[in-house]
Protein backbone atom coordinates (compact mmCIF):
# COMPACT_ATOMS: atom_id res chain seq x y z
CA UNK A 1 0.00 0.00 0.00
CA UNK A 2 2.81 2.41 0.87
CA UNK A 3 4.58 1.60 -2.41
CA UNK A 4 1.37 2.54 -4.26
CA UNK A 5 1.41 5.97 -2.63
CA UNK A 6 -1.25 5.39 0.00
CA UNK A 7 -0.98 6.91 3.47
CA UNK A 8 -0.88 4.27 6.19
CA UNK A 9 -2.84 4.39 9.43
CA UNK A 10 -3.83 1.84 12.07
CA UNK A 11 -6.79 0.19 13.74
CA UNK A 12 -7.61 1.74 17.10
CA UNK A 13 -6.86 -1.55 18.88
CA UNK A 14 -3.37 -1.68 17.32
CA UNK A 15 -1.76 1.69 18.14
CA UNK A 16 1.26 2.66 16.03
CA UNK A 17 0.67 -0.45 13.91
CA UNK A 18 2.52 -2.43 16.57
CA UNK A 19 2.13 -6.15 17.06
CA UNK A 20 -0.54 -7.03 19.61
CA UNK A 21 0.90 -7.93 23.01
CA UNK A 22 -1.13 -11.16 23.09
CA UNK A 23 0.41 -12.24 19.79
CA UNK A 24 3.96 -11.37 20.77
CA UNK A 25 3.67 -12.86 24.26
CA UNK A 26 0.84 -15.42 24.25
CA UNK A 27 1.91 -16.88 27.59
CA UNK A 28 1.88 -13.56 29.47
CA UNK A 29 -1.02 -11.61 30.90
CA UNK A 30 -1.59 -8.55 28.67
CA UNK A 31 -1.20 -6.04 31.49
CA UNK A 32 0.74 -2.80 31.07
CA UNK A 33 1.16 -2.57 34.84
CA UNK A 34 3.20 -5.79 34.80
CA UNK A 35 5.10 -5.45 31.53
CA UNK A 36 5.52 -1.77 30.60
CA UNK A 37 8.89 -2.29 28.90
CA UNK A 38 7.50 -5.02 26.65
CA UNK A 39 4.65 -2.76 25.55
CA UNK A 40 7.10 0.08 24.88
CA UNK A 41 9.36 -2.20 22.86
CA UNK A 42 6.44 -3.27 20.65
CA UNK A 43 5.47 0.36 20.07
CA UNK A 44 9.02 1.32 19.13
CA UNK A 45 9.28 -1.65 16.77
CA UNK A 46 6.09 -0.51 15.05
CA UNK A 47 7.48 2.99 14.60
CA UNK A 48 10.79 1.68 13.27
CA UNK A 49 9.05 -0.56 10.72
CA UNK A 50 7.11 2.40 9.23
CA UNK A 51 9.50 5.29 9.73
CA UNK A 52 10.09 5.78 5.99
CA UNK A 53 6.40 5.65 5.04
CA UNK A 54 3.67 8.28 4.93
CA UNK A 55 1.73 7.59 8.11
CA UNK A 56 -1.07 9.08 10.18
CA UNK A 57 -0.02 7.61 13.51
CA UNK A 58 -2.88 6.21 15.56
CA UNK A 59 -2.08 6.40 19.26
CA UNK A 60 -4.11 5.12 22.18
CA UNK A 61 -4.56 2.16 24.48
CA UNK A 62 -7.25 -0.51 24.39
CA UNK A 63 -7.22 -4.06 25.67
CA UNK A 64 -6.36 -7.09 23.60
CA UNK A 65 -9.14 -8.10 21.26
CA UNK A 66 -10.45 -4.51 20.96
CA UNK A 67 -12.01 -4.11 24.40
CA UNK A 68 -11.40 -1.89 27.46
CA UNK A 69 -7.92 -2.56 28.87
CA UNK A 70 -9.27 -2.81 32.42
CA UNK A 71 -10.99 -6.08 31.46
CA UNK A 72 -7.46 -7.51 31.69
CA UNK A 73 -6.21 -5.27 34.51
CA UNK A 74 -8.99 -4.70 37.08
CA UNK A 75 -6.89 -2.52 39.39
CA UNK A 76 -7.95 0.38 37.14
CA UNK A 77 -11.41 0.52 38.67
CA UNK A 78 -12.32 4.22 38.45
CA UNK A 79 -12.65 6.67 35.55
CA UNK A 80 -9.84 8.76 37.09
CA UNK A 81 -7.40 5.83 37.07
CA UNK A 82 -8.40 4.71 33.58
CA UNK A 83 -8.17 8.18 32.09
CA UNK A 84 -4.85 8.88 33.79
CA UNK A 85 -3.24 5.74 32.36
CA UNK A 86 -4.57 6.20 28.83
CA UNK A 87 -3.54 9.88 28.88
CA UNK A 88 -0.01 9.06 30.01
CA UNK A 89 0.42 6.30 27.43
CA UNK A 90 -0.89 8.46 24.60
CA UNK A 91 1.62 11.15 25.57
CA UNK A 92 4.39 8.54 25.67
CA UNK A 93 3.46 7.19 22.23
CA UNK A 94 3.22 10.75 20.90
CA UNK A 95 6.73 11.51 22.16
CA UNK A 96 8.12 8.30 20.60
CA UNK A 97 6.63 9.21 17.22
CA UNK A 98 7.79 12.83 17.37
CA UNK A 99 11.32 11.73 18.30
CA UNK A 100 11.45 10.00 14.92
CA UNK A 101 9.57 12.71 12.98
CA UNK A 102 8.91 16.11 14.61
CA UNK A 103 6.23 16.86 12.00
CA UNK A 104 4.38 13.56 12.33
CA UNK A 105 0.57 13.63 12.28
CA UNK A 106 -1.05 11.75 15.17
CA UNK A 107 -4.65 10.80 15.84
CA UNK A 108 -6.62 8.91 18.46
CA UNK A 109 -10.07 7.33 18.39
CA UNK A 110 -12.72 8.55 20.80
CA UNK A 111 -14.59 5.27 20.67
CA UNK A 112 -16.65 3.48 23.27
CA UNK A 113 -15.11 3.91 26.69
CA UNK A 114 -12.56 6.48 25.52
CA UNK A 115 -15.29 8.85 24.33
CA UNK A 116 -16.92 8.66 27.75
CA UNK A 117 -13.61 9.38 29.49
CA UNK A 118 -12.93 12.34 27.18
CA UNK A 119 -16.39 13.86 27.59
CA UNK A 120 -16.20 13.46 31.38
CA UNK A 121 -12.82 15.24 31.52
CA UNK A 122 -10.64 12.25 32.45
CA UNK A 123 -8.75 11.92 29.14
CA UNK A 124 -6.12 14.55 28.30
CA UNK A 125 -4.43 14.73 24.89
CA UNK A 126 -1.66 16.75 23.23
CA UNK A 127 -3.25 19.73 21.53
CA UNK A 128 -2.42 18.76 17.94
CA UNK A 129 -3.55 15.12 18.14
CA UNK A 130 -6.59 14.67 15.87
CA UNK A 131 -9.54 13.38 17.87
CA UNK A 132 -11.54 10.89 15.80
CA UNK A 133 -15.27 10.57 16.50
CA UNK A 134 -17.13 7.51 15.21
CA UNK A 135 -20.62 6.92 13.89
CA UNK A 136 -22.65 4.00 15.22
CA UNK A 137 -22.07 1.81 12.17
CA UNK A 138 -25.33 2.90 10.56
CA UNK A 139 -24.22 6.41 9.61
CA UNK A 140 -25.49 8.25 12.69
CA UNK A 141 -22.94 10.19 14.74
CA UNK A 142 -23.85 8.63 18.07
CA UNK A 143 -22.26 5.87 20.15
CA UNK A 144 -22.74 2.35 18.79
CA UNK A 145 -25.08 -0.23 20.22
CA UNK A 146 -23.52 -2.98 22.32
CA UNK A 147 -25.91 -5.96 22.19
CA UNK A 148 -29.15 -4.45 23.59
CA UNK A 149 -27.51 -1.44 25.23
CA UNK A 150 -27.97 1.55 22.97
CA UNK A 151 -27.50 4.87 24.83
CA UNK A 152 -26.87 6.83 21.59
CA UNK A 153 -24.49 9.34 23.15
CA UNK A 154 -23.81 12.16 20.63
CA UNK A 155 -20.39 11.62 19.05
CA UNK A 156 -19.26 15.02 17.79
CA UNK A 157 -17.09 17.80 19.22
CA UNK A 158 -18.79 20.73 20.86
CA UNK A 159 -19.50 23.76 18.70
CA UNK A 160 -16.62 26.20 19.00
CA UNK A 161 -13.97 23.59 19.82
CA UNK A 162 -11.12 24.68 17.53
CA UNK A 163 -8.74 21.80 18.23
CA UNK A 164 -8.17 19.06 15.64
CA UNK A 165 -11.11 16.71 15.01
CA UNK A 166 -12.03 14.04 12.48
CA UNK A 167 -14.37 11.10 12.05
CA UNK A 168 -14.32 7.35 11.55
CA UNK A 169 -17.31 6.72 9.30
CA UNK A 170 -18.77 3.39 8.24
CA UNK A 171 -19.80 2.83 4.65
CA UNK A 172 -19.58 -0.82 5.70
CA UNK A 173 -20.02 -2.19 9.22
CA UNK A 174 -19.75 -5.56 10.96
CA UNK A 175 -21.64 -6.09 14.20
CA UNK A 176 -23.24 -9.56 13.82
CA UNK A 177 -26.60 -7.97 14.58
CA UNK A 178 -28.11 -5.75 11.89
CA UNK A 179 -25.23 -4.14 10.00
CA UNK A 180 -24.73 -3.70 6.27
CA UNK A 181 -21.45 -5.45 5.55
CA UNK A 182 -21.61 -7.03 2.09
CA UNK A 183 -24.60 -4.99 0.90
CA UNK A 184 -25.16 -1.25 0.63
CA UNK A 185 -26.05 0.81 3.70
CA UNK A 186 -29.78 0.59 4.41
CA UNK A 187 -30.09 4.30 5.18
CA UNK A 188 -30.68 6.92 2.53
CA UNK A 189 -28.11 9.05 0.76
CA UNK A 190 -29.96 12.15 1.97
CA UNK A 191 -29.59 10.96 5.57
CA UNK A 192 -25.84 10.43 5.14
CA UNK A 193 -25.39 13.80 3.42
CA UNK A 194 -27.15 15.55 6.32
CA UNK A 195 -25.06 13.72 8.93
CA UNK A 196 -21.83 14.68 7.19
CA UNK A 197 -22.96 18.29 6.82
CA UNK A 198 -23.49 18.26 10.59
CA UNK A 199 -20.02 16.78 11.04
CA UNK A 200 -18.54 19.71 9.13
CA UNK A 201 -20.65 22.20 11.07
CA UNK A 202 -19.12 20.82 14.28
CA UNK A 203 -15.60 21.33 12.91
CA UNK A 204 -14.66 17.66 12.42
CA UNK A 205 -12.91 18.41 9.16
CA UNK A 206 -9.24 17.61 9.76
CA UNK A 207 -9.39 13.91 8.94
CA UNK A 208 -12.00 11.48 7.64
CA UNK A 209 -11.29 7.77 7.91
CA UNK A 210 -13.87 5.70 6.01
CA UNK A 211 -14.48 1.99 6.50
CA UNK A 212 -15.23 0.80 2.97
CA UNK A 213 -14.82 -2.97 3.42
CA UNK A 214 -14.55 -4.59 -0.03
CA UNK A 215 -15.60 -1.36 -1.83
CA UNK A 216 -17.85 -2.72 -4.61
CA UNK A 217 -21.20 -2.85 -2.73
CA UNK A 218 -20.57 0.60 -1.28
CA UNK A 219 -19.35 2.48 -4.36
CA UNK A 220 -22.25 4.94 -4.53
CA UNK A 221 -22.02 5.79 -0.83
CA UNK A 222 -18.25 6.22 -1.10
CA UNK A 223 -18.80 8.63 -3.99
CA UNK A 224 -21.27 10.58 -1.84
CA UNK A 225 -18.86 10.73 1.11
CA UNK A 226 -16.05 11.92 -1.19
CA UNK A 227 -18.25 14.69 -2.57
CA UNK A 228 -19.23 15.77 0.95
CA UNK A 229 -15.53 15.94 1.90
CA UNK A 230 -14.65 17.98 -1.18
CA UNK A 231 -17.69 20.22 -1.47
CA UNK A 232 -19.15 20.44 2.03
CA UNK A 233 -22.80 20.11 1.01
CA UNK A 234 -24.28 17.70 -1.52
CA UNK A 235 -27.70 17.31 -3.13
CA UNK A 236 -28.12 13.58 -2.56
CA UNK A 237 -30.65 13.16 -5.38
CA UNK A 238 -28.45 14.86 -7.95
CA UNK A 239 -25.40 12.94 -6.72
CA UNK A 240 -27.25 9.65 -7.18
CA UNK A 241 -28.19 10.51 -10.77
CA UNK A 242 -24.64 11.66 -11.55
CA UNK A 243 -23.26 8.46 -10.05
CA UNK A 244 -25.59 6.18 -12.02
CA UNK A 245 -24.80 8.06 -15.23
CA UNK A 246 -21.06 7.59 -14.67
CA UNK A 247 -21.34 3.97 -13.50
CA UNK A 248 -24.14 2.57 -15.69
CA UNK A 249 -24.38 5.03 -18.58
CA UNK A 250 -26.84 7.75 -19.52
CA UNK A 251 -29.69 5.69 -20.98
CA UNK A 252 -31.34 4.46 -17.77
CA UNK A 253 -29.68 6.67 -15.17
CA UNK A 254 -32.92 8.04 -13.69
CA UNK A 255 -34.59 4.62 -13.38
CA UNK A 256 -31.50 3.14 -11.71
CA UNK A 257 -31.21 6.13 -9.38
CA UNK A 258 -34.83 5.55 -8.33
CA UNK A 259 -34.06 1.88 -7.58
CA UNK A 260 -31.14 2.92 -5.39
CA UNK A 261 -33.34 5.39 -3.52
CA UNK A 262 -36.05 2.74 -3.07
CA UNK A 263 -33.50 0.33 -1.57
CA UNK A 264 -33.19 2.47 1.54
CA UNK A 265 -36.88 3.41 1.60
CA UNK A 266 -37.97 -0.23 1.85
CA UNK A 267 -35.28 -1.44 4.27
CA UNK A 268 -36.57 -3.28 7.33
CA UNK A 269 -36.80 -1.00 10.41
CA UNK A 270 -35.72 -2.66 13.64
CA UNK A 271 -36.04 0.28 16.06
CA UNK A 272 -37.59 3.72 16.57
CA UNK A 273 -34.72 5.87 15.23
CA UNK A 274 -34.23 7.18 11.71
CA UNK A 275 -31.08 5.11 11.23
CA UNK A 276 -32.53 1.86 12.64
CA UNK A 277 -32.67 -0.01 9.32
CA UNK A 278 -31.41 -3.57 9.01
CA UNK A 279 -28.73 -4.72 6.60
CA UNK A 280 -27.55 -8.13 5.46
CA UNK A 281 -26.26 -9.24 8.85
CA UNK A 282 -29.79 -9.12 10.25
CA UNK A 283 -30.85 -11.81 7.79
CA UNK A 284 -27.67 -13.88 7.91
CA UNK A 285 -26.56 -13.88 11.54
CA UNK A 286 -29.65 -13.36 13.69
CA UNK A 287 -31.41 -16.52 12.36
CA UNK A 288 -28.26 -18.51 13.08
CA UNK A 289 -28.33 -17.33 16.68
CA UNK A 290 -32.02 -18.23 16.97
CA UNK A 291 -31.45 -21.68 15.49
Enumerate the predicted regions with their spans.
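C-terminal non-catalytic alpha-helical accessory regions
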Residues: 237-291
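Active-site clefts of carbohydrate-active enzymes
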Residues: 20-22, 65-71, 161-189
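Aromatic-lined substrate-binding rim segments of carbohydrate-active enzymes
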Residues: 1-16, 224
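Aromatic/acidic polysaccharide-binding cleft in carbohydrate-active enzymes
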Residues: 209-234, 284
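Conserved, mostly hydrophobic/aromatic
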Residues: 131, 199, 211, 243
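Catalytic-core region of carbohydrate-active enzymes that cleave or remodel glycosidic bonds
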Residues: 182-210, 224-229
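Short helix/loop capping segments that flank catalytic or ligand/cofactor-binding pockets
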Residues: 18-19, 69, 118-119, 140-143, ...
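Gly/Pro-rich turn-and-neighbor structural signature
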Residues: 1-3, 28-162, 268, 275-276, ...
Amino acid sequence: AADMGLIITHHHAEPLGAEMFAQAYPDLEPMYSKYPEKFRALWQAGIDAQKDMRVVWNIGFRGQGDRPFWDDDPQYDTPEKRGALISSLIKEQYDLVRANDPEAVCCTNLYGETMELYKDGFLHLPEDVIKIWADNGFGKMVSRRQENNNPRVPALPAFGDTSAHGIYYHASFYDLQAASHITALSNSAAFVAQELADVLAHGADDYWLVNCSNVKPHAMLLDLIARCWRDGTVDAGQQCIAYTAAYYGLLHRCEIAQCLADYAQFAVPYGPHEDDHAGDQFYNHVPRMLI
